[in-house]
Amino acid sequence: MSLIEDLKALKATAVARINATEADVEALRVSLLGKKGELTALLKGMKDVAPEERKTVGEIGNDVRQTITTLLAQKKAAEETARLNEQLAAETIDVTLPGSAHQVGQPHVLQQIIDEIEQHFLGLGFEIIDDIVDSPEVETDEYNFERENLPKDHPARDMQDTFYITPEILLRTQTSPVQSRSLEKHDFSKGPLKMIAPGKVYRRDTDDATHSHQFHQVEGMVVGENITMADLKGTLLSIMQKLFGEKHQIRMRPSYFPFTEPSVEVDVSWNEVTPDMKPEDIEWIEVLGAGMTHPNVLRMDGIDPEKYSAFAFGLGPDRFAMLKYGVDDIRQFYLNDVRFLSQFNRKGN
């Protein structure tokens, strides 16, 4: 049999073997096309072919190689497709089933209260000042005390134990200094100043159920012409009803703060007030301090108290959260116990 006939015979048998094989395609490729494969062995006989037949034999040899290579590639692709389909069938996923639930975070309960306060005052036209430039937590004695009508020898300084860093630098005990910094920059030709300043403050208190060395405060202030105590009362009533409900009322009691005159303590009704309720049936709880800004405070900030008047107030988000949710220990807010904090879901409250 001539080499041409041998090549044609190999092509026919190779096609049949490839189509019928269930074995490893790679092993079949090696047996046909490898260095010791059947086609390679036949083509070694090219040296014995007459020169005039070598071209024809070479073309037939290339055709056999190409045919085998193409069929092997198709067979391999078909096997891979079949294997993938089998795998997909075995790993069928019902896309209608719910996915794995992911735990979703939420703002801390104190941040929720602060956000609620901020949104309310934004609706009243107030600006929020809480940046590090105008609301630093490390403050000077001048802004924290002296600008608030508390000179170095003032007895009211004993009311606040302070974390001093140096004799003139301290951790602020209140957010009131933000008022002074805001007044220094405000252009009253554009209208009155209406601002709140939320932030952390620090006192040298012993931590217990109602005290913390660090807590939150929201200072508020309105400065303009003809600002009265009635404006203060209306403002405070609106935020108390926002936090506790529209049927709650407030009352003001005379008090003393160095930076306001007159000064008041503000109580909110613990129970809802109805028109037919007797005064003695209303339960009151103290929630904040406020008053008309002292003329000395305005003067130290470059404001003429003969032309402008102002009111100021200080809200305690920590205390509001305790009252609103019936929490009896302020330390619970700072222990990072997710079991406790997860109760205060913003959507659910």
Curated annotation (Swiss-Prot):
Binds 2 magnesium ions per tetramer. Its EC number is 6.1.1.20. The keyword Ligase applies. SUPFAM superfamilies: Class II aaRS and biotin synthetases (SSF55681), tRNA-binding arm (SSF46589). Mg(2+) binds at residue 261. It is found in: Cytoplasm. Pfam families: Phe_tRNA-synt_N, tRNA-synt_2d. Its cofactor is Mg(2+). It catalyses: tRNA(Phe) + L-phenylalanine + ATP = L-phenylalanyl-tRNA(Phe) + AMP + diphosphate + H(+). Transmembrane segments: none annotated. Keywords: Aminoacyl-tRNA synthetase, ATP-binding, Cytoplasm, Ligase, Magnesium, Metal-binding, Nucleotide-binding, Protein biosynthesis. It is an enzyme of class 6 (ligase). The keyword Ligase applies. CDD domains: PheRS_alpha_core. NCBIfam families: pheS. Belongs to the class-II aminoacyl-tRNA synthetase family. Phe-tRNA synthetase alpha subunit type 1 subfamily. This is Phenylalanine--tRNA ligase alpha subunit. The gene is pheS.
